[in-house]
UniProtKB/Swiss-Prot annotation:
The lineage of its organism: Bacteria, Pseudomonadati, Pseudomonadota, Gammaproteobacteria, Enterobacterales. It is an enzyme of class 2 (transferase). The gene is thiE. PANTHER family: THIAMINE-PHOSPHATE PYROPHOSPHORYLASE, THIAMINE-PHOSPHATE SYNTHASE. NCBIfam families: PRK03512.1, thiE. This is Thiamine-phosphate synthase. It comes from Photorhabdus laumondii subsp. laumondii (strain DSM 15139 / CIP 105565 / TT01) (Photorhabdus luminescens subsp. laumondii). Pathway: Cofactor biosynthesis; thiamine diphosphate biosynthesis; thiamine phosphate from 4-amino-2-methyl-5-diphosphomethylpyrimidine and 4-methyl-5-(2-phosphoethyl)-thiazole: step 1/1. 4-amino-2-methyl-5-(diphosphooxymethyl)pyrimidine binds at Q40, L41, R42, I43, K44, N72, S111, K140. GO terms for molecular function: magnesium ion binding; thiamine-phosphate diphosphorylase activity. Its EC number is 2.5.1.3.
Length: 216
């Protein structure tokens, strides 16, 4: 890991609530309009020459809605365009300039998949820690096994000083069990983007996770 910071990363809300992870500016625009306030842009298949513009536009849109927009992986562009925060996987921690991210005031979220990675994340004092994957998922190839709700509950209890995010295979039906662990946020991908009616799914999820009932 390069240039380890000697201070904690900027804090974020202890309970981030519903946290959709999407791959395009179009999805960010749709979800911010429905009342989502925490969101992640995880670009996967965009040509490299289009990535910066997509990130810049997403950050501007996030500011417009006063949202907590985290950029996955592209920490240099997140710094350059003044993102709210960055999300890094374990492999990204090795190459990212964590000191630069911390000094610019960006919030940092870190993925973890077991107790060892959780301990490593805590040592960096990030803004939030993602705990996963909780259930089997087809969104991303995972070398680790699903941890399940009981392990999630234990990890949340052992991480009281951090904002925590549950991620991995969480469907609408599984949300109540996940919330019952005390986790501060629920990250979802397919439950929204592959729903028959994404607006209805988002409204249901906002109600389940944050108690927000959308009008109209």
């Amino acid at each position: 890991m390069n240039n380890l910071p000697n201070a904690p990363f900027a804090p974020t809300e202890h309970r981030l609530g519903l946290y959709p992870v999407v791959d395009s500016l179009a999805w960010i625009s749709r979800l911010l309009q429905t009342g989502v306030t925490t969101i992640q842009l995880r670009i996967k298949d965009l040509p490299e020459d289009q990535v910066e513009e997509e990130i810049q536009q997403a950050i501007m849109l996030g500011r417009q809605y006063n949202a907590r927009l985290f950029i996955n992986d592209y920490w240099r562009l997140a710094i350059k365009h003044g993102a709210y925060g960055v999300h890094l996987g374990q492999e990204d921690l090795v190459i990212a300039d964590l000191n630069a991210i911390q000094k610019t005031g960006l919030r940092l979220g870190i993925s973890t998949h077991d107790e060892q990675e959780l301990a490593r994340a805590k040592s960096l004092r990030p803004s939030y820690i993602a705990l996963g994957h909780i259930f089997p998922t087809t969104t991303k190839a995972m070398p680790s096994s699903p941890q399940g709700v009981e392990a999630l509950k234990r990890q949340v209890e052992n991480t009281p000083d951090y904002s925590t995010v549950a991620i991995g295979g969480i469907s609408l039906e599984r949300v109540p069990d996940v919330i019952a662990t005390g986790v501060g946020s629920v990250a979802l991908v397919s439950a929204i983007t592959k729903a028959k009616d994404w607006r209805q799914a988002t409204a249901q999820l906002l109600y389940l996770v944050e108690g927000i009932e959308l009008k109209g």
